[in-house]
Amino acid sequence: FDTPEELEQMRIRLRTESNPTPQYDLSIRTQMRNSLSLSKEESDELIQKNTPHVIRIKMPEKEIVSFTDMIRGEVSFDTSVVDDKVLLKADGMPTYHLAVVVDDHLMKITHAFRGEEWLPSASVHVLLWKYLFGEEHMPQWAHLPLILGPNGKLSKRDGAKYGFPVFAMTWKDAKTGEVTEGFRERGFLPEAFVNMLAMLGWNDGTEQEIFSLDELIQQFSIEKVHK
C-alpha cells in the first residue's frame, strides 16, 4: 500500500555508497505498509477503501534457486539478494514477470529462448512456476547473448545514428509514428539475413562463414552458442 512518495523516501533513507539503489526486499519489507506489517483487518479496510496497492512476490529467505540453462548450464541464485518484484500493478495490469509465466503456461511452451538481460529475473520466474503451476511444467530456458551496438546493447536508435538497419523489415513505432527502415527494404536477401543472424553468437567450430539454410539446420547445435 506504499505511495510513490513513501517508496522514494525509503530509497533516500537507505541509500548508501555501497547500496546506491535500495530494493524492496526482505531487509525492509516489514518496515513498509503491506500485509506483513499490517493486520488482516487493516489490509482489508484499505482494500475496501480502494486504496491503490500492488501485489508483490515475497521472496523466500536464504534459499538457493537453481535451474539448467541450455546455453549456460547450471544457474543458481541466492534469494536473499533478490527483491520482491511487483506482479500486479496498482491499475490491475500484470508486470512482465507474471504475464510471461502465465502466458507460457497457457500456450504450453516447452522451450523459451530470450536475451541474457532477463537472466537476473530467472529466479523470480522459477519460483512463480513452482508456486503457480509446478516447477516440473516449467519450459527449458536458453538465455542468448545480446546483439551489441557500438556502445552496448543494440537499440533501434543505433540504426538511425550509425546508418545500419536493426529490424528485419521496416518497423513503425505505434506511439511516436517513427519509422525505422529494415534489412528487406535495404535489399538484403532473406538467406543472407538468416546467415548473418546465425553467425552472431554461434559458429560450428570451422572457418565457414556462408551457410545455406539446410546447412544451418544440419550443423546448428545449442551447445555452440556463445555464453
For the regions a protein language model found, what residue spans apply to each?
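Active-site cores that bind ATP or allylic diphosphates and position pyrophosphate for catalysis
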Residues: 2-161, 165-166, 179, 204
